[in-house]
């Protein structure tokens, strides 16, 4: 019997709710079978579009959603009772889901019919994406509230998507992906169990609603074996740790986006082949096949994909699902000695690392003591070193670099660009929204939200009330900040200089030593991340490399204002300021830093 195809998505959203809605309708008309919403950084980090930290970030890497009016526009003409919607949202996941539910209630749609997923994995935010806001304990409380609320009110909703995807994007090895992601899942489920609001049978069903979001890299056999190991280990953990009896509730359910870290700016047309090969690893093995797949576009190393670029990735999925005979056969790898041995070894190694994390107190302790972050920073450094040394071949980057001019990028930059007016228009619309809403309703809703946050009352009902009253993203988050506080995650950077035999590094180190001797002190290098971009692995690797070259490095983590960076540079008397900005806001933010420096 032929299997049904996986859910086919493209990760999309930019500029405004209106433009993103047009993009969604266009993609759905081409055969996409689910939505995957990308939010801009202010929305992800809980700021309204007019906040100082939102400057330059509005609409850049996703769609800005400040209130229920924006959500109405975003999902206009999209039937919520028929759509499977994935939202890549974490610290503010409870709020964005509340807006979604409030819109469904407004349209008289039965909550039982809402299908979708909120990513809602805050532990990996501390480790990779950097959109966390609150400390671990209250963050896990918010996740627990969402899990128990959706179990009772939205039975078809996946409240948490445990993400190993982002761990691979910052350098995790396959065994680290397995162990870190499973430790994260256990941390969330343990918190739900401790809340003691569900019966044993209800908790077993909650376990069955946990889903995962994984990565698939270019090492095809290893990645496929990793997925089979995930299936076995999750069955093992849910059975032995939680006593889940029903095999359906022990099933490893996952969606995937294939690797973006390996997409290259050089010869970007080669990325099409990388994307296809990486996808094969998660769809060929029937017993470990993804339930949903979204593919990056070939040009994501260059910038924001255009509609045509997204269509190309969509067609790739459709050809594999509908033209090939892949879905007509049982698992192709059952009985393979090579596969079985590889899977078993990965399970042994992953259990060892998982148990090590549990012995230190679990994933949250591993965040707080920086163990998990340091492991990822070190793994990523090893990966980069292998590429720099030529041990790991990347076609077009360190081998086969000669190329003809690509017709795909010959006539323009080959990417979508965001109109600079978007931010001003969004701020103007936000001010109009505030002016025209019923402030009495807003004040009442915020008061109830504060009461819920300060008590053990589930946060979701008060959040839905706030959404219906017209509360904004920034206002909801400010309540949580006031009650829970904020958290700056460890950077994972150490000043331990590691010996290298790379000639380029050794040459730079000689020059650093010579200049330092001449000036009477070590070259001091401040690495700053202004704005809201939390993808810190680039900055971390620059910090590690600069330290290895003999510089004194100052790196204070993510989400700094231009004024804070300039203040630190003066107080620390640095020689060099380096900036890492991956959200497309570099021109504006660099300009602001230069202006601040001139004032001093």
Language-model regions, residue ranges each:
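Cofactor-cradling patches in redox/metallo enzymes
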Residues: 539-600
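Glycine-rich anion/phosphate-binding loop at the beta-strand->alpha-helix junction
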Residues: 182-185, 213-215, 220-305, 309-313
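Short acidic (Asp/Glu) and glycine-rich catalytic loops that position anionic groups and cofactors
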Residues: 3, 50-54, 80, 124-126, ...
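Conserved, mostly hydrophobic/aromatic
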Residues: 31, 67, 108, 234, ...
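Flexible, glycine-rich loop/tail regions that form catalytic "lids" or insertion modules at the edges
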Residues: 306-307, 311-318, 322-507, 562, ...
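Catalytic alpha/beta active-site cores
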Residues: 1-223, 241, 248-257, 289-296, ...
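Short beta-alpha connecting loops at secondary-structure transitions
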Residues: 55-60, 85, 124-133, 167-171, ...
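Mobile "lid/hinge" segments at catalytic clefts and subdomain interfaces of large enzymes
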Residues: 121-124, 139-196, 273-354, 360, ...
